[in-house]
């Protein structure tokens, strides 16, 4: 977009947020190079303290606000020399306590031209003003220094080409040291300022004249690519050769230059030798992931080694029989084995899919443990902790066990995903049970196990076939491979009525099979064939039919793999919002590309233990309060999460989004009465078995699948890529730390013919999705320089072959009715079949 400038006088500041310097102001226009025709314009952006009635020039892009019309989104600004009257008004404003109009006039009279610079240079002249006390004088100078310094720094940062948001993040991190630090060490931003990546830091460094082959540039790119690869792929390490390749691509594309790969390899060697990153043989680790994996091994080993008095098997068996009698159930052999092993082990792993009785076994473990130790489960001070990765999973645990449960973050006192700290003492418990452990990443697992005492018994529960954690690692899957850890896998399905087929479907898909009756209508599930272009028309009809049958709109959840596209989360959220909560007059708040309305269904995106709201929690907007009525002077959204009221001002709205449709990842740990699952070939590489399996197992009563049979077929046969982790080897002690920490040695070893990639990739079926899945062919025997001069071979794979009548083709889809011969009565019949 083109940048325009607007020069003029600030009429008034409409809104300001002191925490991030975001301001909205009204500018009376004197001059502009745009074709904007009005005499005043709204200007928004990050800026320091500005003065009403003073002249400024703002540069930025013209944007169209749905409510306020065309406005300028500022990227940088300059203040003209302030007038005497403007300074008097500024000094006498609420910014400065104890300064009235007469005192302000006297200050301007004493200091003359450019008074702000002169005041900061020589504040002693203020002593000439008799009615200005020493306290007010010092407060005035201190506040002026902050305001003026902030403006100067933010303005200077903007002049370097930094976005207002980036400038604000940098200033919040370094305050008055911001300019000195970034001018001397711009690449430090990559490591220390959240949200500032390599490209932003590199643009700044280029403006400061730092060469494209400067060592600090190469090091910053290596560190950035190392962590980026882990976050994107879920790996805890990356092979040296792959890291070098990724880094050189970034370095060369950022400045359109060619680099000598040997220079980058040298800097990687230096990083390893300086312990800025870690290596095991040819594997390169981000420091936090290396030590987190090592910590998991260390702490679990510590816990296992301490063997306090464990009840004998016959004593456990006797207590278990009493529990069976109390509950009126009989555990089968595998379930009994699981309960006995769990109570005899310091660390035990229980796995199983839906309907296999995990909750029944957990309740058996808890009640038998209580009987063995003489505990009254009705008391509040039990030495038992129940934990889960998400708030919804923790609440489900509480509902199923009737015991207190909380998120892992709450138990550890962590307030967000990025909050890393060590507890001063161990968790106060003798038994801890952690559910939904497949969602726990390497960092969180390390913090959890570090906080568990030697004498505590640990029971890990999860479904190994669900999606792995969003963060790096596959801790549950890796721990299941450790021979020394006792474990039981539940496979027999118990929770299924005669008419229930969802659990059976999930079990078949888990085994990589699309059952022969997949497209048949069942009492609890249905499938509708649809091209991606038809999904937006079909979903509202399905939801409407569900509501007409008596199902609450809150009980219907759309799950999708992707955010973009016609069948994506963003589009479906907009469609469903207009269907279920249409706009009434102007009662909505715009935020980025979203409109928030009263009664909207919303999803919380981060953990906040102070507010008792967590990542994945679903709530309702209860009220929208305009800024002119709030203490914060910002628009505020009032929300309820299961009765817990939360209020967010505008600067915190990035913590929430609409929840009519949500990602399958975000749905983990939750169950919904009705799940609508649109799956088409648009989702491409994301279509993997564990993704579909996770989505299907979220449905408690009804499951509606719609999309393309080819996409479902591909997904269930595609196991996806296995993550690169090193946790198993740490337990097996089958590795040696590289003594010679040199990349030259690493590359030489690889060049002898061994493969440089350890990631096990299973591309699923031999025929993959059309135009979606690509492979990169790298010859590991080439030397490093030649590797990067070779073109990447991208070959398009063939589509899944399915029976032609199962899917729409490019030739015929546009000629078919959007409902594809399906009547609304057909949909209604499914929901009315109770």
Task: Specify the residue positions occupied by each region the protein language model found.
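Short glycine-/polar-rich loops that comprise or flank the Walker A/P-loop
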Residues: 53, 58, 382, 429, ...
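Accessory, non-ATPase domains that flank or precede helicase/AAA+ motor cores in DNA-metabolism machines
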Residues: 1-309, 828-834
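Conserved helicase motor core of P-loop NTPases
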Residues: 465-604, 608-611, 811, 816, ...
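Conserved nucleotide-binding/hydrolysis modules and their immediate coupling elements
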Residues: 6-14, 18-63, 327, 577, ...
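Pre-Walker A segment
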Residues: 279-353, 369
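ASCE P-loop NTPase helicase motor core
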Residues: 336-339, 343-519, 710, 721
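C-terminal accessory regions
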Residues: 624-630, 636-834
């Amino acid at each position: 977009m083109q940048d325009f400038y607007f020069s003029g006088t600030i009429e008034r500041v409409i809104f300001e947020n002191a925490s991030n310097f975001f301001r909205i102001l009204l500018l009376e226009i004197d001059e502009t190079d745009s074709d904007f025709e009005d005499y005043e314009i709204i200007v928004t952006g990050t800026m320091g303290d500005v003065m009403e009635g003073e002249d400024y020039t703002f540069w930025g892009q013209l944007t169209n606000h749905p409510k306020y019309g065309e406005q300028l989104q500022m990227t940088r600004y300059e203040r003209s020399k302030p007038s005497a009257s403007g300074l008097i008004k500024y000094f006498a404003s609420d910014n400065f306590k104890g300064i009235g109009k007469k005192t302000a006039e006297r200050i301007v009279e004493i200091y003359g031209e450019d008074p702000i610079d002169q005041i900061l240079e020589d504040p002693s002249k203020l002593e000439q003003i008799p009615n200005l006390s020493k306290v007010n004088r010092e407060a005035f100078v201190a506040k002026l220094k902050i305001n003026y310094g902030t403006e100067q720094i933010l303005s200077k940062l903007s002049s370097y080409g930094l976005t207002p948001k980036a400038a604000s993040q940098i200033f919040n991190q370094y305050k008055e040291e911001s300019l000195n630090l970034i001018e001397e060490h711009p690449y430090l931003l990559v490591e220390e300022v959240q949200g500032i990546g390599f490209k932003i830091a590199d643009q700044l460094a280029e403006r400061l004249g730092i060469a494209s082959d400067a060592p600090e540039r190469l090091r910053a790119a290596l560190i950035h690519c190392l962590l980026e690869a882990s976050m994107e792929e879920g790996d805890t390490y990356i092979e040296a050769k792959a890291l070098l390749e990724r880094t050189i691509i970034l370095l060369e594309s950022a400045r359109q230059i060619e680099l000598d790969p040997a220079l980058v390899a040298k800097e990687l060697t230096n990083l390893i030798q300086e312990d800025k990153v870690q290596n095991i043989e040819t594997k390169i680790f981000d420091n936090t992931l290396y030590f987190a994996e090592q910590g998991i091994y260390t702490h679990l080993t510590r816990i296992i080694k301490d063997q306090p008095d464990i009840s004998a098997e016959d004593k456990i068996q006797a207590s278990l029989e009493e529990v069976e009698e109390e509950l009126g159930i009989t555990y089968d052999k595998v379930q009994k084995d699981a309960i006995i092993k769990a109570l005899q082990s310091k660390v035990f792993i229980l796995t199983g899919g839906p309907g296999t009785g995990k909750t029944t076994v957990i309740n058996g473990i808890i009640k038998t443990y209580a009987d063995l130790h003489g505990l009254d489960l009705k008391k509040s001070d039990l030495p038992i902790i129940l934990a889960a990765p998400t708030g919804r999973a923790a609440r489900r645990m509480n509902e199923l066990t009737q015991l207190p449960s909380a998120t892992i973050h709450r138990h550890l006192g962590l307030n967000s995903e990025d909050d890393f700290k060590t507890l001063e003492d161990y968790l106060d418990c003798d038994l801890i049970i952690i559910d939904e452990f497949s969602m726990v990443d390497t960092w969180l697992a390390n913090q959890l196990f570090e906080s568990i005492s030697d004498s505590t018994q640990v029971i890990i529960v999860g479904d190994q076939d669900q999606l792995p954690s969003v963060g790096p690692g596959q801790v549950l899957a890796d721990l299941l491979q450790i021979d020394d850890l006792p474990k039981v896998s539940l496979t027999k399905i118990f929770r299924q009525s005669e008419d229930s087929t969802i659990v059976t479907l999930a079990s078949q898909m888990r085994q990589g099979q699309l059952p022969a009756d997949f497209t048949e209508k069942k009492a609890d599930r249905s499938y509708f064939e649809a091209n991606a272009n038809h999904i937006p028309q079909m979903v509202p009809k399905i939801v409407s039919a569900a509501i007409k049958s008596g199902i609450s709109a809150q009980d219907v959840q759309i799950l999708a793999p992707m955010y973009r596209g016609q069948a994506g989360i963003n589009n479906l959220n907009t469609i469903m919002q207009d269907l279920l909560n249409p706009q009434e007059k102007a009662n909505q708040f715009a935020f980025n590309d979203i409109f928030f309305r009263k009664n909207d269904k919303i999803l919380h995106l981060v953990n906040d233990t102070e507010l008792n709201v967590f990542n994945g929690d679903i709530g309702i907007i209860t009220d929208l309060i305009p800024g002119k009525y709030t203490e914060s002077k910002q628009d505020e959204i009032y929300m309820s999460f299961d009765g817990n009221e939360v209020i967010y001002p505008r600067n915190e709205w990035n913590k929430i989004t609409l929840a009519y449709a949500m990602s399958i990842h975000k749905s983990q740990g939750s169950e919904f009465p009705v799940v609508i699952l649109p799956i088409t070939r648009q989702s491409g590489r994301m279509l993997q078995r564990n993704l579909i399996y996770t989505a299907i197992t979220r449905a408690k009563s009804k499951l509606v699948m719609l999309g393309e049979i080819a996409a479902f077929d591909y997904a269930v046969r595609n196991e996806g890529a296995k993550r690169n982790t090193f946790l198993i080897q740490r337990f097996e002690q089958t590795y040696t730390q590289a003594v010679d920490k040199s990349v030259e040695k690493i590359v030489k070893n690889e060049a002898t013919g061994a493969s440089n990639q350890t990631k096990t990739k299973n591309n699923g079926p031999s025929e993959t999705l059309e135009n979606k899945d690509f492979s990169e062919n790298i010859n590991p025997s080439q030397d490093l320089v030649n590797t990067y001069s070779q073109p990447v071979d991208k070959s398009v794979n063939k589509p899944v072959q399915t029976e032609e009548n199962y899917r729409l083709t490019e030739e015929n889809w546009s000629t078919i009715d959007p409902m594809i011969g399906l009547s609304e009565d057909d949909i209604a019949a499914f929901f009315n079949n109770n």
